[in-house]
Amino acid sequence: MKKSEIHFRIELDQNNVPEKILWDATDKPEIGFTESKAISLSLWDHEQKNTLRIDLWTKEMPVNEMKRFYIDCLGGLAQSVLTATGDENMSGEINSLCERLAVQVRKSE
């Protein structure tokens, strides 16, 4: 059986605030760690029937980039819902929310 691994390395300042987020994966085309400004990881706990989340971002990430990041995460969820369940209505509602949020972000820039 094939196995894949994803690794995260988080460099923290003296107050435990992320200064650098690095990641690597066995299936990534580039070799070595790649820097990112934010990660949002969700894991389904099937025993507790809830989601465990890890959200990290560097202190250097601008607020508008953070907003765009979360809008993009929601858009990815819309596609995942469609792929996993075939629920076009739910996927469409999430995409509609993304469009409204994107308009608000553009207005604030």
Where are these regions (language model features)?
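Short loop/turn motifs at secondary-structure junctions and domain boundaries
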Residues: 1-4
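Active-site and channel-lining beta-strand-loop segments
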Residues: 6-25
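Active-site- and interface-proximal helix/loop "cap" or "latch" segments in soluble metabolic
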Residues: 19-85
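C-terminal charged interaction modules
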Residues: 78-109
